[in-house]
């Protein structure tokens, strides 16, 4: 059985460090604030946003909430974005996705002030990441990819020269994690697999590290991985469990793979807590840039 990479423990340590940094900021007259824009009442989104504000309270970051009804128009959402852009109490913020049908998510993201882009997903910030493959970056980084890399670092997993197979090309991680993995400081070699990739499983069998972000429960099987590989499970599927009569969250990696792996992230309890921690880290870093 491989080493279980505990995202909850690493996230807790990260938040403890951030709480100290927030105290130093307050001592110098800077109060960080995280804003959220929530449109509608999707249970998953409501729960996720509530978790973010609970994290804020834990480390001393102020919460700024903007809630709109399910039938909100594009202009109403855009107005909420502009309000947070102009609000000096808001250090950074996120627009909780998905937005209701009929609202262009990309157009809304484009309206976010890049300096307040807590998710690190604004085109300007992604462009900075593309341009600067070396040295420090003074713009927010995508939370989930950053969380993956910080989680592996916490377990002293060196990715230099490693073959990394990324499954899925979604913007949250699939298309963005390669930008971080191929930076000089990480130095991994990345293969991005998607629905058009021929013989995906052959790519998986060659990989030292698999980052699974497809949203297909149990897609990665033991026969698809080599002995001693590292498995990072970012996929989220809700699967009905007949025993409990409830839906449960399942990852992309079949748990039988853990026997062959050198290390693995459980799902839930692996990358998810780190994504939330990296959101806080982005906000604290934004505040520190004001010094």
Segments from the language model and where they lie:
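Short, well-structured alpha-helical segments in soluble
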Residues: 76-88
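Short beta-strand segments enriched in small/hydrophobic residues
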Residues: 31-40
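Short beta-strand elements in bilobed, periplasmic/extracellular small-molecule ligand-binding domains
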Residues: 34, 56-70, 189-192
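Positively charged, low-complexity intrinsically disordered leader regions
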Residues: 1-30
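Anion-binding alpha/beta catalytic cores of soluble intermediary-metabolism enzymes, centered on
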Residues: 94-164
């Amino acid at each position: 059985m491989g080493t279980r990479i505990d995202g909850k423990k690493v996230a807790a340590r990260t938040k403890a460090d951030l709480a100290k940094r927030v105290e130093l900021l307050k001592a110098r007259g800077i109060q960080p604030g995280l804003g959220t824009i929530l449109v509608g009442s999707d249970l998953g989104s409501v729960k996720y946003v509530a978790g973010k504000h609970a994290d804020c309270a834990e480390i001393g970051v102020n919460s700024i909430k903007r809630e709109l009804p399910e039938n909100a128009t594009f202009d109403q959402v855009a107005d909420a974005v502009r309000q947070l852009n102009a609000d000096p109490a808001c250090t950074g913020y996120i627009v909780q996705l998905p937005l209701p049908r009929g609202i262009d998510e990309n157009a809304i993201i484009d309206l976010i002030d890049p300096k307040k882009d807590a998710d690190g997903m604004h085109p300007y910030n992604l462009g900075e990441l593309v341009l600067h493959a070396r040295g420090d970056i003074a713009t927010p980084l995508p939370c989930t990819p950053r969380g993956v890399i910080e989680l592996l670092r916490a377990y002293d997993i060196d990715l230099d020269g490693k073959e990394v197979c990324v499954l899925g090309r979604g913007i949250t991680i699939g298309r963005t994690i390669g930008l971080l993995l191929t930076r000089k400081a990480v130095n991994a070699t990345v293969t991005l697999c998607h629905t058009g990739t021929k013989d995906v499983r052959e790519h998986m069998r060659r990989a030292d590290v698999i980052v699974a972000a497809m949203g297909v429960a149990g897609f990665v099987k033991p026969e698809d991985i080599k002995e001693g590989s590292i498995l990072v499970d970012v996929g989220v599927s809700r699967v009905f469990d007949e025993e409990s009569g409830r839906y449960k969250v399942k990852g992309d990696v079949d748990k039988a793979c853990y026997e062959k792996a050198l290390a693995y992230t459980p799902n839930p309890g692996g990358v998810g807590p780190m994504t939330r921690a990296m959101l806080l880290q982005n906000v604290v870093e934004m505040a520190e840039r004001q010094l």
